[in-house]
Amino acid sequence: MTAPIWLTAADTALIGDRLCALGWLAPDEALTDVASAGDGNLNLVLRVFAIGRSAILKQARPWVEKYPTIAAPVERSAVEASFYQLVRAAPALRTFMPQLLGVDPAWHLLLMEDLGEQADAAALYHRASTDAAARTQLIAFLAGLHALDLPLAALPDNRAMLELNHAHIFTLPFAGADSDLAATAARLGQRYLLGAGPLLHGDFFPGAWVYGDDGVKVIDPEFCLFGPPEFDLGVMAAHLIVSGDPPEAPDHLGAAYQSAGGGAVDSALIRRFAGIELWRRLFGVAPLPVVLDHRRKDALIALAAGLIRA
């Protein structure tokens, strides 16, 4: 097994050689171009082109792509690959995600189906929430995902990634919060760290939703974990609020989830996780991709605190 080389978009020849060595390119086939495939937060994400086809190449490097000073375990690539394989095995879910075409454990590479040049759903932040059809599809995806009956061994060990996420969601953003709020966040963080419950996407926000010709797709399950379904729902609800939904979005989302066949959920816990997501996007290292004036930011801070204490 060769040691990994940490790639960049400029490494066309090296990437071509690696894809040929893996059998992902035919011997008489060559790459014609390599380009960035968007602003990846966690991983290097490239679009690779050969004659008549393209694919997405992801590499987990030993740091967070957007924040290179933050170390991150490269084993997350194997965990993400397992998530895609589990979803692919579920007929009701496989159409929601791009197909995993190849896995290179030595260089921590994933080769993915290219969904095309569609943008993610970040435009939602600049208009009034999701359209009804997309929202229905996203809720159906979560209900189906959480219904999978899987043993914990279905995913490779993800403890290091879980602890990194925990720090940046439940601990570091609350360094300047009042003690009661920080203590509540810490208790919720312990629920997250337990690793008990159904399989979760782990970062179910507009950056992971891609609109295509055949409906909305879900990508980037890099933070997947076993945990409370209310966590996925709370993250989704927080971003729906930012994109125009009322503060009652967590309750509405929980009801819609159960109507879609999802299991029973705790509405208060959805509210608390929604508050956590809002707070960490306001005070953590991964801010919302919107410009907030002081009035709007103060309103979201107050709402987040109220939801966490709900």
Task: Say what each PLM segment does.
Residues 19, 83-87, 112, 257, ...:
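Structural element of the ATP-grasp superfamily
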Residues 82, 230-262, 274-293:
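Active-site activation/catalytic loop segments of kinase-like enzymes and analogous catalytic loops
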